[in-house]
Structures are given as C-alpha cells and as structure tokens.
Amino acid sequence: MRERITFIQKQGDSIEPTTLKIKGGVLNGPEIQAAREDRLTIAIDELPKDLQALLGTAHELHIRYVSSQPYEAITPLLARLPPGFHLFYTPAGQADATSPALCLALNQIFGNVQCENPEKSFTTLPRDRFSHSAAYQFYQPSVDLSPFIALVKEKLCSSSKDQSCAARADRLANASSLDISYDAISHAVKLTATWPYQKQEVHATSRPQTRTEVGVLNSDRPGHLEPHELGISGLLTVLGQDKKPSATMFAFASRHRDAESSFSAEFLEPTGLHPTLKLRLESSKPPIEDAYCSPHAYFTLPKTIFADRHQLSDDLFLASKNLTGLRYISQPVDLEAPEYVEKRWGSSLLLELSPPEHEESKSWTVQVPLHLRYLSPAEGGYTDIQVPYPAVFWACAAEEGTKFPNNPFEKANLGYDGLFGPRTVFWHVEPRPTIGSRLSNMIKVPVLDTNKAEWVSGGTGLAVLLGFAWIMWKLFGVLSKSGYQNQPSQAAEVVKAKKNQ
C-alpha cells in the first residue's frame, strides 16, 4: 500500500523548509493557502475478498465524483467534469455486462445508484476511435458519499492505529472530487481525493505497512519549459525514512491546462417543456495563438432531459445559436419515451461552439435547445429536476510529434477525452454559478397532480363512456331509419343491370 499527500500552491507561493517538522513518522507545518490531493494505491490482493471478486469482472473501472459546489482549480489539478457521479467501465467478459453484480455493489457502497446492469442502464462509448476509451458510461446527477465514508472507516480505519484516519475519512464529504480507478493491467486500485485551493493545515501521519510520501509543491515556469509542459517545484519527504524535506523540481507534459476564463449557465425563461440553456462565456479569445483551437461543451444529461440530434444537425439553426456542430451524442436516445420507462441513465453529448469573430476580448453567449421528458405524477403538480453545468474547454492541437505520457497528476477516462486525438490539449474554462452556490440549474416541470389524479382518471373514463354512447346512439338512429340492407348496394345494382342486358 502506498500513500501520497500533496499540498499544491500557486506560482509565487512558498513555504520555509524549516517550518516543516518531522518526528516519529508525523509531519507538521504551518497553515498555508493550497489545494490538497490525497492518493492511496492498494494492490488488489490487499482488498477484501468480495471487492477482489467484483474487480475480477472488470477490465477497467473508473468512478469519478465531482462536487456541485464551485471550486478554484489550480495547476496541475485542472481536469474538469460536469458535477455528479460518473462511471466508466469495461467488463472482463460479455457475461459481466449483463450481470447485476456491479450495480448491486454500487448501491452498497454509494447508496441510491439507479442502475440494473451495464447493458440495460449504461450507455456505450465509441471505442473504435481511440483505444483509451472505456466500453460503458454511467452518470447520476447526485450521490451520497456517506455510505462510502462509512465503508472506508470500516475497512481502512478499524485496524489502523492512526487516530486521524476516521477524521480524514470524514473530510471526504467536503472534497471537490473523488476518483476510484482500477485496471486489470496494474492490478491496483487508486483512490484519489482533492480539496480546493483554500487554507490547509500541513499535517500528515504515516501508517504501518504503508509508504507515505508528502509533498508541498507549487507551479513553476523554468526557462527550459516546453509549451506543452508544466513545471513543479517544492519540497518532498517520505515519512519514516527522511529526517527532513528535500527540494525538488520537475516538469511533465499535460493535456489539461487553465484557459484563465470563466462561464455561467442558465435556462431562458419561461422554460416550458422545451427549455433553452444559455451559456455565457467571459472571453472568445483562444488560450494560445499559434495552434488551432475550438471551444467545446461536454454535457451529461440525466434521463429527465435530452437533446435532439436531428435538430442539432441543421447548420442554419446551429449558426443562429452560436453553435458549430454536434460532434458526439450517445445512442440510443428515445425522443418520445417518458422518463419513468427509460432504463438508461440519460445521454452525453459534445457540442462545438462558434465564437464571434473579431471580438476576442468580449463575452459571448451560446444557446443549447433541450427537451424535457414526461415525468411521473407528483403531489402539487410540479417536480423539480437538476441539470448540471457542462464542462467547457478549448480543444487545441499540440505540435506534430508531441507525446503525452502519464504524469503524476494526469486524469484520463473523462468521457470527452476519448473523442479527441492523443495530441489534443484541453484548456478548461472555470464554471461559475449564476444563482446560488451550486453548479446546476433547477427546472420546475409540470406533471400530473396526484391529489387530482382520481378526478382526472374518473373524468377520462366518463368522457370515453359518453363518447361511446354517442356513437352507438348515432348508429342506432341510422339503422332505425333505413334498416339493415334495405337499400341495395351500388355493386348489387350494377350486377343486376348486367343480367338484364
């Protein structure tokens, strides 16, 4: 088992090495302004037998939880996803795709995860484009981390002598993101949690049979840095091995960068059953000038709302909304089915945006047409649904021959990264809430009022009965006047005339 705790400051921040005290496998330091990332790497044979059996059904499994609270991301922790619970999965065999084992385990670990099995509830990803895409995708707008935190306390903290283990597990409730990744090649599970840029107390404790590495780092820009690289400098120490921190400086290629811009999202009023989501971007200026760049928005829409790919195929319509084109949408998307009969989680789509020309420093807007599904009846006649913010980024092509090997902070299997080539660099635009403090928008959807459902069903039945009675009365009136077959049909008259000739 290996543990890595990293405090990351902005460029220009610094900490005096003498303020870090190491004693008996414990590191203490001052309170600093920094982001924090904790990563725990566990070999599969160190896990409980039931989890080993579950992971044996997966070739790869990536769970990504993103908080709906806005947070400031700093270099190199820049990769973003829409807020919510994301899962990317490749089964070990075809039979595992139809097994309910994964969904049952997700419900035990995270509570109410609405899935039956991957084949029914997940959507498929286009693996024919780039090899690093998983086979299936699942998404849910919200999930409760309390069951997972309780599981961590039970499995990791119950046998640990570290008094801070339970407290660290409780801090997961305030994490900006939580990632759990497994692949059959490494035979290891990586749990990674990040907290946003804020005041953090520098403190770390080593655990028995665990190699604990602690870093206090900040972004740096040495003169030899390549355009596609990020520089990092700071202090590193291995608890229980080093007596004092060691200075370090290194650089690595990264596909995720900061566009140093922001956007917001809100629905135009009135929303109706065909709401339009308006994105307002702070700047239309590309993040770099010496490469081809295009802005994109990646959506994960729950099954209560969807986009119509036919509508998004009209070039003139797209141009009127400042959209260039629909680059991807998951399939199938039933345009008529109500929400309560849909088995799949929803749909994901990638839209290329069309920034205005010759206005590089001004804000601009994009309109995305969406459609609501019919929802289940509810008391009061309305149901509130949450629509998460998309992930907005500029996709820029790196120079020919540029390679992006794995780096210590890299994130892959994000859903949209598999839709681009391996030399694409993502310059992320920071989301900012328009109203409130959540990166989602609420829509009040009209539904059948359960308090009036009896009147509606009774009235419908009465209307059908009256309509049937009226039709029968009219038929009876016609028959009573003319009788049945009293008048010969036109065909019979023709036959009779021919016989008489």
UniProtKB/Swiss-Prot annotation:
Superkingdom per UniProt: Eukaryota
Membrane topology summary: Single-pass type III membrane protein
Residues the record marks as carrying a glycan: 174, 322
Keyword flag Aminoacyl-tRNA synthetase: no
Main location, first listed in the record: endoplasmic reticulum
GO CC, alphabetical: endoplasmic reticulum membrane; glycosylphosphatidylinositol-mannosyltransferase I complex
Pfam families: PIG-X
Keyword Transmembrane: yes
GO BP term (any one): GPI anchor biosynthetic process
Residue ranges annotated as Lumenal topological domain: 1-458
Known role: Required for proper folding and/or the stability of a subset of proteins in the endoplasmic reticulum. Component of glycosylphosphatidylinositol-mannosyltransferase 1 which transfers the first of the 4 mannoses in the GPI-anchor precursors during GPI-anchor biosynthesis. Probably acts by stabilizing the mannosyltransferase gim-1/gpi14.
Protein name, entry field: Protein pbn1
Annotated source species: Neurospora crassa (strain ATCC 24698 / 74-OR23-1A / CBS 708.71 / DSM 1257 / FGSC 987)
Gene that produces this protein: pbn1
